[in-house]
Amino acid sequence: MSAKRRKVSSGNGAIKEASIQIQKPKTKPQPVTAPVEPSAVPNSEAESETIDDASGEESEEPAPKTFQDLGIVDSLCDACKELGWKKPTPIQQESIPLALQDRDIIGLAETGSGKTGAFALPILQALLDKPQPLFALVLAPTRELAAQIAQSFEALGSLISLRCALILGGLDMVQQAIALGKKPHVVVATPGRLLDHLEKTKGFSLRNLRYLVMDEADRLLDMDFGPILDKILKFLPRERRTFLFSATMSSKVESLQRACLRDPLKVSISSSKYQTVSTLVQNYVFIPHTHKDTYLIYLCNEFAGQTIIIFTRTVIETQRIAILLRTLGMGAIPLHGGLSQSARLGALNKFRAGSRDILVATDVAARGLDIPNVDCVLNLDLPGDSKTYVHRVGRTARAGRSGHAISFVTQYDLELWLRIEAALGTKLTEYSLEKDDVMVFRPRVEEAQRIAKTEIKALMDDRGKKGSVLKGGKGRKRGPPGSSRDHMDAEEG
């Protein structure tokens, strides 16, 4: 049941373990770049050819306009239509033809550019040609991103009987071992839990793997997964195709490229480290710190009926704002690292499904998550750096859609805001509003603040003795359903 927010008043073949006859496209897809002659192959695997979307020099042919033009078979094109993918994004246009040529790929593109489709479609098409279990492995840095990728694979593979296993930390390992024992076609995993299964789960092997994908590779390495990735690579066959996708090309990513890719082609869509998409409208509001909540409620009221992500800096502030909004009749749900894994996935699913139209989040959701149709991002607390700002506002205006991002700047945030503007290379405009209109909400906001304060205190008192994340403790590493971490989200259902 959808809980809409009210304004505050004042080809259908199935994958079988045998050969499959697939209807090939009538027109052979044109390669984006000419095949590399043996004499032109780089001597070192560290080198790679680069295709820069900004140059427009890699092909004289017009850019493909449909997935069929890229060489994708009809059954997968139909799945794209079901998902509302009307035409390929730039990263998909550049990457898919190369992947269909059986090449390793490094894809560099900003968040929200359609990277999942860029690697999922070629993998599924190859699976249709030569079906086998444990065909592809996708590694992601966070549980939420892994869950999102698995959902995309399942949606794209819905017409071809795809089997996909999601392997995450924080969930039952025995149930995951059972799922792996059923020989899925695609495994989507976080690195730590996958390594646990490779080392401990009897009968589980990836020695016949055909495809490896590392999504958000820069973040995988920023989160110190490097040693775990090294161990995982030892369990994989060297004869495979590898796709590495990243927002940036750091020295760590280059080292990873040398370790696991063979003669890769580099596809670069991003032209600036701090680039945002042209369909994103960015503004700020300069406000007194003491009235942040009132301005927040005013803006949520202005965007009533639209989907909003509100970013805060701390777990406790995320909880407080969610309570504040719910008290005022708005469908808000929190997302932060203090929640159990099931509660975090539940929050994302409720927001995606539309049963909640406001997601209040820490930066756990600021990168990599594909949440479709987010209309507005509100930076209630400014991020600590420009890179995080770009990742936050990238939650809206995705895949060619329009979006709006508004940042709250108080008297204490001026220096930080100027640094963000400098990194963006532009002076953003102030969002137009009338202070008198905002202050009409103040009495109701103050009452809601008192209620939120009382609820937060009760929650902290209830959890404090158990190492509450809200009180700054580490919390418990594990716990059965119904334990303290799940209690934090009890009123979200």
UniProtKB/Swiss-Prot annotation:
It is found in: Nucleus. A motif (DEAD box) lies at residues 215-218. It comes from the Eukaryota. It is an enzyme of class 3 (hydrolase). Residues 1-67, 462-493 are annotated as: Disordered. Residues 291-439 form the Helicase C-terminal domain. One of its GO terms (biological process) is rRNA processing. One of its GO terms (molecular function) is ATP hydrolysis activity. InterPro entries: DDX47/Rrp3_DEADc (IPR044765), DEAD/DEAH_box_helicase_dom (IPR011545), DEAD_box_RNA_helicase (IPR050079), Helicase_ATP-bd (IPR014001), Helicase_C-like (IPR001650), P-loop_NTPase (IPR027417), RNA-helicase_DEAD-box_CS (IPR000629), RNA_helicase_DEAD_Q_motif (IPR014014). Pfam families: DEAD, Helicase_C. Its main location: nucleus. ATP binds at residues 109-116. It catalyses: ATP + H2O = ADP + phosphate + H(+). The keyword ATP-binding applies. Its EC number is 3.6.4.13. Residues 96-267 form the Helicase ATP-binding domain. The Q motif is unique to and characteristic of the DEAD box family of RNA helicases and controls ATP binding and hydrolysis. ATP-dependent rRNA helicase required for pre-ribosomal RNA processing. Involved in the maturation of the 35S-pre-rRNA and to its cleavage to mature 18S rRNA. Interacts with the SSU processome. This is ATP-dependent rRNA helicase RRP3.
